[in-house]
């Protein structure tokens, strides 16, 4: 036939280095077929050939889910080719561009609590004192360590939030005060909405109650019908404009609205008196007259630059002044109580009962009002036999 191959073998392309993209021919097990390991070792010793680095790394599951067939001599003698399921470590990711260009990686900064423990104190004063340190200030203002430089770091969300809701170094907001401050307006808004929805039904209900006082057997038909303006049968509380009883219904509802406005005015006076907005001089003991004006013996004048006078003065004929300070709260209520007690001595017996009522919480008062609103008429009919016992109970209450 001929002599063995003495020249460089060419096959699988002009290049002697045959790539191995599919991972076949690991460890050159098929080289003896081409006599590459015997008489023509040029295949293994070709410096330009691919060394096939991935040939020996047959991934687990490359020939099926979780299985590598033990093909032995065909695929090589690696543990993967022998059917041993071993996981080879993955190659590290390639280096980034900036590291190839010579830039060194940024070292990990130590924790702030280790380098500057004084900056970790939850105290605004100590925190601002720590900012005086240039090293600590450089952490927050990298551009020169000053907030007045042209190059400032981008503000964070936390800094924006703190700058909106509070000043730098200011005290933390008290959530209890915020909640209590919002609860009052919400309750008032709820009451206003309730009154707006009931603005027509409340006068009508009161009108029905007022009219029912004249008709114990129930509300009859409206007696205001005549032949000139015939109307259908209706109640006296819902007269149409063509009915002669319409003007009386309007008069009753107008009086009801006046009483509602009077109740609102009383509620406003009570609120202002509780907040100390009504500086009423109390009655001076032993005198029935009070007056406000400059006092010779008072440290603070009754008529001064302040919004409200701080003391009340009684001016007898001799010119001497008796000064009594105005209460900071319930000034009008105390004045009315002293005025009524001076004229009706039996009211002094109710002092303990009034003090007990004042000591009740608003929740108890709201519960009592709600019970009277719904169960009041029924309770009146049930408790009517016991009404004569009420004075005896009050006397025993005061005496004990």
Swiss-Prot record:
Family: Belongs to the orthohepadnavirus major surface antigen family.
Annotated region (Pre-S2), positions in chain: 120-174
Keyword Membrane in annotation: yes
Database matches in InterPro entries: HBV_HBSAG
Known uses: Systematic vaccination of individuals at risk of exposure to the virus has been the main method of controlling the morbidity and mortality associated with hepatitis B. The first hepatitis B vaccine was manufactured by the purification and inactivation of HBsAg obtained from the plasma of chronic hepatitis B virus carriers. The vaccine is now produced by recombinant DNA techniques and expression of the S isoform in yeast cells. The pre-S region do not seem to induce strong enough antigenic response.
Pfam families membership: vMSA
Gene name tied to this protein: S
Alphabetically ordered keywords of this record: Acetylation, Caveolin-mediated endocytosis of virus by host, Fusion of virus membrane with host endosomal membrane, Fusion of virus membrane with host membrane, Glycoprotein, Host-virus interaction, Lipoprotein, Membrane, Myristate, Transmembrane, Transmembrane helix, Viral attachment to host cell, Viral envelope protein, Viral penetration into host cytoplasm, Virion, Virus endocytosis by host, Virus entry into host cell
Signal peptide limits: none
Residue runs in coiled coils: none
Hydrolase keyword on record: no
Annotated region described as Disordered, given as residue ranges: 84-114
Described purpose of this protein according to its UniProt entry: The large envelope protein exists in two topological conformations, one which is termed 'external' or Le-HBsAg and the other 'internal' or Li-HBsAg. In its external conformation the protein attaches the virus to cell receptors and thereby initiating infection. This interaction determines the species specificity and liver tropism. This attachment induces virion internalization predominantly through caveolin-mediated endocytosis. The large envelope protein also assures fusion between virion membrane and endosomal membrane. The middle envelope protein plays an important role in the budding of the virion. It is involved in the induction of budding in a nucleocapsid independent way. In this process the majority of envelope proteins bud to form subviral lipoprotein particles of 22 nm of diameter that do not contain a nucleocapsid.
Pre-S, as annotated region: 2-174
Region (Pre-S1): 2-119
Organism in which the protein naturally occurs: Hepatitis B virus genotype F2 (isolate Argentina/sa16/2000)
Virion surface-side positions: 2-181, 275-348, 399-400
Name of the protein in its database record: Large envelope protein
Gene Ontology CC annotations of this record: membrane; viral envelope; virion membrane
């Amino acid at each position: 036939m001929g002599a063995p191959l003495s020249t460089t073998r060419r096959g699988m392309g002009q290049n002697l280095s045959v790539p191995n993209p599919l991972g076949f021919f690991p460890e050159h097990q098929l080289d003896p077929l081409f006599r590459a390991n015997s008489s023509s070792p040029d295949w293994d010793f070709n410096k330009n050939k691919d060394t096939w680095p991935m040939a020996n790394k047959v991934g687990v599951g490359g020939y099926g889910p979780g299985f590598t067939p033990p093909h032995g001599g065909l695929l090589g003698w690696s543990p993967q080719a022998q059917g041993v399921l071993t996981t080879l470590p993955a190659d590290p990711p390639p280096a980034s561009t900036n590291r190839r260009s010579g830039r060194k990686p940024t070292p990990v900064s130590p924790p702030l609590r280790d380098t500057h423990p004084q900056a970790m104190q939850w105290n605004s004063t100590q925190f601002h004192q720590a900012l005086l340190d240039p090293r600590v200030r450089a952490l927050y203002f990298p551009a020169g360590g000053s907030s007045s430089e042209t190059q400032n770091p981008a503000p964070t969300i936390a800094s924006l939030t703190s700058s909106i809701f509070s000043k730098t170094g200011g005290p933390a907001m008290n959530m209890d005060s915020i909640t209590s401050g919002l609860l009052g307006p919400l309750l008032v808004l709820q009451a206003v909405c309730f009154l707006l929805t009931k603005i027509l039904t409340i006068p009508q209900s009161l009108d029905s109650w007022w009219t029912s006082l004249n008709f114990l057997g129930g509300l009859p038909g409206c007696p205001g019908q005549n032949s000139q303006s015939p109307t259908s049968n209706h109640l006296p509380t819902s007269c149409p404009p063509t009915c002669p009883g319409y003007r009386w219904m309007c008069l009753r509802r107008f009086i009801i609205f006046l009483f509602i406005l009077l109740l609102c005015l009383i509620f406003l006076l009570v609120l202002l008196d509780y907040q100390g907005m009504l500086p009423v001089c109390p009655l001076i003991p032993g005198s029935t007259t009070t007056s406000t004006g400059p006092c010779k013996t008072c440290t603070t004048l009754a008529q001064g630059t302040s919004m409200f006078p701080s003391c009340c003065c009684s001016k007898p004929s001799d010119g001497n002044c008796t000064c009594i300070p105005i209460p900071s709260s319930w000034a009008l209520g105390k004045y009315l109580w002293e005025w009524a007690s001076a004229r009706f001595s039996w009211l002094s017996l109710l002092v303990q009962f009034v003090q007990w009522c004042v000591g009740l919480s608003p929740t108890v008062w709201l519960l009592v009002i709600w019970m009277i609103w719904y169960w009041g008429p029924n309770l009146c009919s049930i408790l009517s036999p016991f009404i004569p016992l009420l004075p005896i109970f009050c006397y025993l209450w005061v005496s004990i």
